[in-house]
Amino acid sequence: MIRVELPYHLRNLAQVDREVSLVVDGPVTQRAVLDALETTYPMLRGTIRDHTTQIRRPFLRFFACSQDLSHESPDAPLPAAVVAGEEPFSIV
């Protein structure tokens, strides 16, 4: 299970708590996590990434293991602690 922390406005929109748990099939990347998040919570589609380009919205940042991953490739593997569920993938 991958843990994802959401900011207040996205929590309100999805009607969830601060942290959600997701099952991600295949390699755990930003793209895979966001795809799983948008599949589980369709009301979040287009709020984190642009509908057409799938590029991160400029007002959001991605963090994991105290690292800013916002400018990393969306297909780069996430840190092992995130994959193991020890640390959350944070959307700020």
Where would I find each of the regions flagged by the language model?
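Ubiquitin-like/PB1-type beta-grasp interaction modules and other compact soluble beta-rich domains
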Residues: M1-V92
